[in-house]
């Protein structure tokens, strides 16, 4: 089967410099959703028709299995498909999809393709309570589809029809090519309508069949930011419903955003206003606090993420406790039972089991052993303005509050750094290292007094 995806539209109502099909829905471009669904059908040829912003669309797709055709002038859907016909295999049918209709399920498309077979024309239709703006499906007395009439070309009788065209169709490729060659733009829009091939098929006696989606939202398209926002909420609601059915506890299913792939184990609890981006895995018993953002990360069994945390490209070990207000940056790997507390930032660091940094610390480019205590105000000084250097803190070390570790530097096993230390040389294991000025009390010192302003 050939699949042609129409993605050439300018999207004027989006009021954006970004091509319409590149606007994100649940974290990825509209067109990417359509391509993902198309690939599940294993097409022999997959062609994307581009036009406005074509170079940016090609760059986004960036896949060797996808061919492109260009529609330089926006002269309608029929004209768009004409640009792709030379790349199609005539021995198999062609399915036409739309880059701004992202949520049509593969099962629905398979049903349409199955109903059409190799020699019928198949149309995906839907019944709408308010069909305004859609092409109407016109049937004869026997219920056979005879034509599709666009809104601007419809008479009063046709406008009263509630069965509408979704634009998605499948038909024999050789027939499609011949019908496209006969299309006219003599209509209110001055465009070449793909839907006119229905009338051509009927006149030639080609059987026309139809299929229907299970849900109306499968056929909804995007022509404005309003419609994009509506579709985002619909898709998020569907994703939340699936999570609930899979056994995840959502404190409020209406207040979760999944912008990628979220995989959850058993007894996972997710509080309100959490955002999951990219590929995120939450193992058994994980609890995610409110207002947390997690991107491309794995949270292992029994870990708890307290509210207002930000975790990106990091791994959190089993039974660890993160937050509130903690940030784990790319390259962070935490072993089991690690505590990262409020206003602690960890970047590109490995922290072994049972270690803690409970308050106000920066741990960057560091290797931290087991059972290490990192006091409040500790900073690994990893950057000299040009290069990054690593800090190594071995097992059972104790880092006092307000300590600066100027990398490259090593803290030995069981070593203690006194509060306020600025460490520039390795600290030996099992010993106390302190570097700060001796405390002095000046008896005769007087605090300056502000002078009162006259007048």
UniProtKB/Swiss-Prot annotation:
Keyword list, A-Z: Acyltransferase, Cell shape, Cell wall biogenesis/degradation, Cytoplasm, Magnesium, Metal-binding, Multifunctional enzyme, Nucleotidyltransferase, Peptidoglycan synthesis, Repeat, Transferase
Catalysis: reaction(s): alpha-D-glucosamine 1-phosphate + acetyl-CoA = N-acetyl-alpha-D-glucosamine 1-phosphate + CoA + H(+); N-acetyl-alpha-D-glucosamine 1-phosphate + UTP + H(+) = UDP-N-acetyl-alpha-D-glucosamine + diphosphate
Biological-process GO terms, alphabetical: cell morphogenesis; cell wall organization; lipid A biosynthetic process; peptidoglycan biosynthetic process; regulation of cell shape; UDP-N-acetylglucosamine biosynthetic process
Region (N-acetyltransferase): 247-455
Pathway(s) the chain acts in: Nucleotide-sugar biosynthesis; UDP-N-acetyl-alpha-D-glucosamine biosynthesis; N-acetyl-alpha-D-glucosamine 1-phosphate from alpha-D-glucosamine 6-phosphate (route II): step 2/2; Nucleotide-sugar biosynthesis; UDP-N-acetyl-alpha-D-glucosamine biosynthesis; UDP-N-acetyl-alpha-D-glucosamine from N-acetyl-alpha-D-glucosamine 1-phosphate: step 1/1; Bacterial outer membrane biogenesis; LPS lipid A biosynthesis
Region annotation Linker: where it falls in the sequence: 226-246
Free-text remark on how the cofactor is bound: Binds 1 Mg(2+) ion per subunit.
Active site: 359 (proton acceptor)
EC category name: transferase
Highest taxon above the source species: Bacteria
Compartments, record wording: Cytoplasm
Protein name per its UniProtKB record: Bifunctional protein GlmU
């Amino acid at each position: 089967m050939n699949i042609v995806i129409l993605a050439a539209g300018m999207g004027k109502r989006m009021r954006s410099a970004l091509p319409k099909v590149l606007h994100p829905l649940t974290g990825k471009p509209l067109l990417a959703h359509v391509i993902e669904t198309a690939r599940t059908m294993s097409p022999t040829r997959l062609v994307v028709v581009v036009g406005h912003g074509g170079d940016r669309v090609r760059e986004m797709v960036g896949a060797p299995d996808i061919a492109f055709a260009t529609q330089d002038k926006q002269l309608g859907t029929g004209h768009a498909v004409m640009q792709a016909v030379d790349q199609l295999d005539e021995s198999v049918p062609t399915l036409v999809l739309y880059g701004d209709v992202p949520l049509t399920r593969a099962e629905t498309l398979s049903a349409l393709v199955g109903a059409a077979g190799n020699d019928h024309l198949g149309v995906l239709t839907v019944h709408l309570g308010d069909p305004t703006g859609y092409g109407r499906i016109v049937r004869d007395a026997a219920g056979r589809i005879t034509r599709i009439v666009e809104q601007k070309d419809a008479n009063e009788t046709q406008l009263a029809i509630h069965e509408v065209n979704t634009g998605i169709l499948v038909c024999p490729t050789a027939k499609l090519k011949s019908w496209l060659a006969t299309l006219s733009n003599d209509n209110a829009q001055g465009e070449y309508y793909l839907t006119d091939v229905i009338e051509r098929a009927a006149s030639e006696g080609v059987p026309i069949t139809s299929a229907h989606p299970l849900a109306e939202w499968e056929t909804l398209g995007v022509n404005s930011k309003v419609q994009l926002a509506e579709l985002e909420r619909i898709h998020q609601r569907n994703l939340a419903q699936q999570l609930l059915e899979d056994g995840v506890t959502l404190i409020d299913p209406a207040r979760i955003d999944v912008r990628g792939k979220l995989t959850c184990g058993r007894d996972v609890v997710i509080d309100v206003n959490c955002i999951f981006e990219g590929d995120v895995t939450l193992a058994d018993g994980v609890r995610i606090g409110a207002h947390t953002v997690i991107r491309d990360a794995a949270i292992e069994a029994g870990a708890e993420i307290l509210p207002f945390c930000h975790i990106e490209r990091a791994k959190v070990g089993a039974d660890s406790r993160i937050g509130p207000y903690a940030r784990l940056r790319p390259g962070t790997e935490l072993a089991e039972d690690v505590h990262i507390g409020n206003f602690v930032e960890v970047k590109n660091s490995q922290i072994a089991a049972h270690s803690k940094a409970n308050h106000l610390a920066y741990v960057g480019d560091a290797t931290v052993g087991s059972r290490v205590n990192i006091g409040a105000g500790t900073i690994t000084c990893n950057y000299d303005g040009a290069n990054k250097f690593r800090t190594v803190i071995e097992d059972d070390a104790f880092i006092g509050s307000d300590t600066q570790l100027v990398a490259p530097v090593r803290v030995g096993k069981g070593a203690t750094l006194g509060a306020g230390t600025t460490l520039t040389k390795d600290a030996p294991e099992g010993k106390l290292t302190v570097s700060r000025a001796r405390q002095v009390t000046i008896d005769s010192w007087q605090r300056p007094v502000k002078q009162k302003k006259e007048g």
